[in-house]
């Protein structure tokens, strides 16, 4: 879709939704076609005057609804900084709905100002009453989840508050039906020529997207391929439940965490791309995949991959090894595993790009 068409659809949909009362909007959302549910909330597809709209209902806890906390980007529950990571063996409790709204506002404004087009537009948002929902599977065993994420009372309070939430922050977003995982999977099935073209484009687009966000004080922190949408012409980074910005109301500790993780999005997307390519082309599980990437980091060529994918794996294998080790330790040994910034800097300095 062209920029002009996107903006025209956005104008029409946002105006239509803004005209709805809370009761009307609540009924519309209730009648929308359910798409799924997960740790970040529930989603549905809504038709607004012929335009499909993606609806995301993010649990809004009672604490977040207190007058002093409305629209606050502070760490209201006092969660430890390692809850920022989206790579735990058990899904994390998240840092709150208002941060997600703030990032959607930020990214939508970038699109409207024609600074960048790599984000879905937020047409509208509203706080709507909701019935308390069962916890997502990852958090359903509260004791296990609390223990995994450090055992602190702050984590317990956050998870229990999610379970008791009686409202949702309802986001009405531009609908882009295909994610990058699906699209790239189709491209590599179309033969080596299509695969080479797609892999090269995805590598460039991931770098462009993360660089743009990071240069504007935003770290996504969860940019895996199911959180990135595509129409085959550009990528659209979405799902900001773990996003972090220096423009948020951060404590000194979390401000330092933000500064230390300036390379995180770039490293995470590189790690994910390399891991995805080796899995897709070789059919390997984690252990075999990491063994192959380790061999590539020492100079071996992965002959099973077409040229573009092979070049990507070779280029980023050393960095992927470091990130794989970090994620393994974070998942299985300690949530307080330090981010390997110095090692990352050394690799980047020796092999730029």
Kindly give the residue locations of the regions a language model identified.
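Regulatory N- and C-terminal appendages and interdomain linkers associated
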Residues: 1-53, 59-70, 281, 300-353
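C-lobe/activation-segment region of protein kinase-like
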Residues: 236-343
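Catalytic-loop of the protein kinase fold
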Residues: 215-225, 230
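Conserved ATP-binding subdomain of kinase catalytic cores across diverse folds
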Residues: 30-171
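Amphipathic alpha-helical segments that form well-ordered structural scaffolds
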Residues: 97, 102-110, 179, 205-212, ...
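A generic secondary-structure signal for well-formed alpha-helical elements
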Residues: 62, 108-112, 217, 273, ...
